[in-house]
Amino acid sequence: MAVKIRLTRMGSKKKPYYRINVADSRSPRDGRFIETVGTYNPLVAENQVTLKEDRVLAWLENGAQPSDTVRNILSKEGVLKKFHDSKYSK
């Protein structure tokens, strides 16, 4: 089972916000997911992001692949740097 960290669209028409979910890659975008690890609101001036960093790092260590957009969000939040440092600091 290939696991992805990706965005699930929520909200109403013209006013989206997104949940950052861990899901099987074969499930639909807004379908079944394993765990919610954060939220992303692109309509706020600063693109409000909340993350459960410990859970995101745990999923990355277990081999979950982030989507391109989630990879950019994690990079801006500094999570990928922490993951890289923990992986290669041995």
UniProtKB/Swiss-Prot annotation:
Q: Which InterPro entries match?
A: Ribosomal_bS16 (IPR000307), Ribosomal_bS16_dom_sf (IPR023803)
**Which keywords annotate this record?**
Ribonucleoprotein, Ribosomal protein
In its keyword annotation, does this UniProt entry include Transmembrane helix?
Answer: no
Check the record and name the Pfam families matching this protein.
Ribosomal_S16 (PF00886)
GO biological process: any one? translation
- The disulfide bonds in this chain are none
Keyword Ribosomal protein recorded: yes
MF terms in GO: structural constituent of ribosome
Task: Specify the superkingdom.
Answer: Bacteria
Q: Which GO terms describe its cellular component?
A: cytoplasm; small ribosomal subunit
Q: Which family does it belong to?
A: Belongs to the bacterial ribosomal protein bS16 family.
What is the protein's name according to its record? Small ribosomal subunit protein bS16
Instruction: Name the source organism.
Output: Streptococcus gordonii (strain Challis / ATCC 35105 / BCRC 15272 / CH1 / DL1 / V288)
What lineage does the source organism belong to?
Answer: Bacteria, Bacillati, Bacillota, Bacilli, Lactobacillales
Encoding gene (name): rpsP
